[in-house]
From Swiss-Prot:
GO terms for biological process: cellular respiration; Mo-molybdopterin cofactor biosynthetic process; nitrate assimilation. This is Periplasmic nitrate reductase. It holds the Pfam family Molybdopterin. It is found in: Periplasm. Residues 39-95 form the 4Fe-4S Mo/W bis-MGD-type domain.
Length: 828
């Protein structure tokens, strides 16, 4: 495709900006100089965060050589963040894996052996032997999978089918457990359905933005650019930012609030009290569309049952609640006075009042945004519920320019982990394994015997680590994630299980990550546009892309790996006789035939692909695998408020926001005139609940699982930086991004550094009760912690900060709190 004049000018502008910054943009600038005809362009969503920016990918001679923002993409409108401009280089690191590697000694597998190249058949041989042995000796609960919010939609769907229907094990969980699980449970408790009701179009219509534990300037920079434009172009627009430390988003804030860790719960209840005391309740909305419930308290911290905190909890893991009156709710929040809140949070009273006034003002359209500050929290579900309370009390929800919005961090945490249902307790379209009706729906659609899908919830992410350590989980396959670096409490709860000789660990990844190097078998994986894919972003937008280049060497997509491995198992080897007796026609068939090469999935011929269109999996199998899997999966949500468009529509569009009914996407759910599931005259209907009403929960402040004391005297918070994404397995292989932020540092208040005889640039040992790492003191820069708190990013494999973190989780969502543990510092 030729570059248009608009694209030419945009490319040169990008090149000029990059030159000014001392960077070299891969492709776009070079594409406009003498090679316009040679480069082929096609659309794709960005490989990084959950914003879902659209990019144009330029390929030449079988390689991705260029990338630019897609001017027709409604999310980013042609703009990329710094990571997006370097997308081509993530695929071509010098250490890209191109063949399977098995730990071997003397020509055979050995847990202590060296990684040795083998063939795919040899890799599947050893995997088959390990899986079959575990299934025969200990049953389905002895095998597990850890997947990803970076899986494509059909990869997650194929994995879920293989484990839940094929192997009859619900021990499959995504890394989204570490980032979005609290948001999921929060949505389900309050609304009965997952995912936001609003969309990014709210930004241009809002009067106020409140960020709760979200550094959008670095983590969602394209959305932040839209918020910045809205704020700077309208003097009446207000931005409030709440965090436990000062970061780049504070630069735009009219009200920048730094609070004591965990005390966001106090602030949320104070605002609810303020709304009530100032008669700011939207009485019409509240009386028609809201119920009130009091939640169980003292629910523990998701630690091992033997931990003292779990033994002391009165209602460990309880999500119980009971109806309550408005007067009781009013009395409950009345305890959270301005004075008490200021004392508990350390926030000045005037700042608290300014914040509360935004929500209480009936003429202010308010959007609440949050990410990991809320979700990675031992009371993360409660925090989600409590922010919904503010919008439900005021009726500021499901309308243009106002509403609560949970931002996601991975490109398909919504589309794959949540919507497909790759969590240990979920099935497609918000269905769950504990519901017999839901299991029956899936079993009938998949044409498998009734009773195949287990009713017992499988092991969640942290429980998988513990089960590996305890020898209960023995074969473990991780895909598209680097949990040995990203997960909590590496020393005590993860590494022991991975290196236990009783266990066999498989890692599928494009690069030799910390996880891969700790495994027994490494499978080289195709990435991004080396396969056909689909992601679902934070605003319910499903986006497709075509395969545009082939993977290097013998690297294969996660989808190929799952489907081909399923050929190794016949139904008699994985299902008991009582199940086979219900469907005798399935005897002797492989799981490939039962799950993937079915009449339902294989009915779309490969001839639907253009003659020159790459699609390695479908051309090898002889049918359009991705289309078949997607259409089967989409069936579950159609007619139930999760409607997805037909497969072919997505290749033509720049994404569509579900529910898509009669060809029309939905911008705002639950409100009349916007949502096709809300009838005329209903006004609002939260149809995830049987009575159509959302729930306001009374939930108190409860302390963190671990706080500073005399010995471990500092809070530690962990997170990300703009230049790197998660564990840096892709971005650190981009030279320009690596040079921009080459190693992790410990951000610390200058007075805390001085008190410990530390200076900027000094090496420092950071020590918790679980481990220690060496880092570099940073008293300046983008992050400015208050006294008593230090901040450290987790992208650096040489500084595994998660050796320090505690594996405490929200007891309801099972999501880890990476934001709060206690450490001490020692000068090196």
């Amino acid at each position: 495709m030729k570059l248009s004049r608009r694209s030419f000018m945009k490319a040169n502008a990008v090149a000029a900006a990059a030159a000014a910054a001392g960077l070299s943009v891969p492709g776009v600038a070079r594409a406009v100089v003498g090679q316009q005809e040679a480069i082929k362009w096609d659309k794709a969503p960005c490989r990084f965060c959950g914003t879902g920016c659209g990019v144009l990918v330029g390929t030449q001679q079988g390689r991705v050589v260029a990338c630019q923002g897609d001017p027709d993409a409604p999310v980013n409108r042609g703009l990329n963040c710094i990571k997006g401009y370097f997308l081509p280089k993530i695929m071509y690191g010098k250490d890209r894996l191109t063949q399977p590697l098995l730990r071997m000694k003397n020509g055979k597998y050995d847990k202590e052996g060296e990684f040795t190249p083998i063939t795919w058949d040899q890799a599947f041989d050893v995997m088959e032997e390990k899986f079959k042995t575990a299934l025969k000796e200990k049953g389905p609960e002895s095998i597990g999978m850890f997947g990803s919010g970076q899986w494509t939609i059909w990869e997650g769907y194929a994995a879920s089918k293989l484990f839940k229907a094929g192997f009859r094990s619900n021990n499959i969980d995504p890394n989204a457990r570490h980032c979005m699980a609290s948001a999921v449970v929060g949505f389900m408790r309050t609304f009965g359905m997952d995912e936001p009701m609003g969309c990014y179009d709210d930004i241009e219509q809002a009067d106020a933005f409140v960020l709760w534990g979200a550094n959008m300037a670095e983590m969602h920079p394209i959305l932040w650019s839209r918020i910045t434009n809205r704020r700077l172009s309208n003097q009446n627009v207000t931005v409030a930012v709440l965090s436990t430390y000062q970061h780049r988003s504070f630069e735009l804030a009219d009200n920048g609030i730094i609070f004591t860790p965990q005390s966001d719960l106090v602030i949320l209840n104070y605002i609810a009290n303020y709304i009530i005391q100032n008669n700011a309740i939207n009485q019409d909305f509240f009386s028609k569309h809201v119920n009130l419930r009091k939640g169980a308290t003292d629910i523990g911290y998701g630690l091992r049952p033997t931990h003292p905190l779990e033994k002391a909890a009165k209602n460990p893991g309880s999500d119980a609640s009971e109806p309550m009156s408005f007067e009781d709710y009013k009395a409950f929040v009345a305890e959270y006075t301005l004075e008490k809140t200021a004392e508990m949070t350390g926030v000045p009273k005037d700042q608290l009042e300014q914040l509360a006034q935004l929500y209480a003002d009936p003429n202010k359209k308010v959007i609440s945004y949050w990410t990991m500050g809320f979700n990675q929290h031992t009371r993360g579900v409660w925090a989600n519920n409590l922010v919904y309370n503010l919008h439900l009390l005021t009726g500021k929800i499901s309308q243009p320019g106002c509403g609560p919005f949970s931002l996601t961090g991975q490109p398909s945490a919504c589309g794959t982990a949540r919507e497909v249902g790759t969590f240990a307790h979920r099935l497609p379209a918000d269905m769950v394994v504990t519901n017999e009706k839901h299991r029956d729906i899936c079993e009938k659609k998949w044409n498998i015997p009734s009773g195949t899908i287990p009713a017992k919830i499988g092991l969640h992410a942290v429980a998988q680590d513990r089960a590996l350590k305890d020898g209960k989980l023995n074969v473990y396959w991780t895909m598209c994630t680097n949990n040995m670096q990203a997960g909590p409490n590496i020393n005590e709860e993860r590494m022991p299980g991975w290196r236990d000789p009783r266990n066999f660990i498989i890692v599928s990844d494009p690069y030799p990550t910390v996880s891969a190097l700790a495994a027994d078998l490494i499978l080289p994986t195709a990435m991004w546009v080396e396969k056909e894919g689909a992601y679902g972003n934070a605003e319910r937008r499903t986006q497709f892309w075509r395969q545009q280049v082939q993977a290097p060497g013998e690297a294969k997509s996660d989808l190929w790996q799952l489907v081909q491995f399923s050929r190794r198992f016949k139904t008699e080897e994985v299902w008991p006789e009582e199940l086979l007796a219900k469907k005798p026609e399935l005897r002797g068939k492989t799981l490939y035939e039962v799950l993937y090469a079915t009449p339902e999935v294989s009915k779309f011929p490969v001839s639907e692909l253009a003659e020159d269109q790459l699609n390695d999996e479908s051309r090898e199998l002889g049918f359009y695998l991705q289309k078949g899997l997607f259409e089967e999966y989409a069936w579950f949500g159609r007619g139930h408020g999760h409607d997805l468009a037909p497969f072919d529509d997505y290749h033509k569009a720049r994404g569509l926001r579900w529910p898509v009914v009669n060809g029309k996407e939905t911008q705002w759910r639950y409100s009349e005139g916007n949502d096709p599931y809300v009838k005329a005259g209903e006004g609002y209907k939260f149809y995830g609940k049987p009575d159509g009403k959302a729930v306001i929960f009374a939930l108190p402040f409860e302390p963190a699982a671990e706080a500073p004391d005399e010995e471990y005297d500092l809070w530690l918070s962990t997170g990300r930086v703009l230049e790197h994404w998660h564990t840096g397995s892709m971005t650190r292989r981009v030279p320009e991004l690596h040079r921009a932020f080459p190693e992790a540092v410990l951000f610390i208040h200058p007075l805390d550094a001085k008190a410990r005889d530390l200076r900027r640039g000094d090496k420092v040992k950071v020590v918790s009760r679980r481990g220690e790492v060496i880092s570099i003191v940073e008293t300046r820069g983008r992050n400015r912690p208050p006294q008593g708190l230090v901040y450290m990013p987790f992208f650096d494999a040489a500084q595994l900060v998660n050796k320090l973190t505690l594996d405490a989780t929200d007891p309801l969502s099972k999501e880890t709190d990476f934001k709060k543990c206690a450490v001490k510092l020692e000068k090196v």
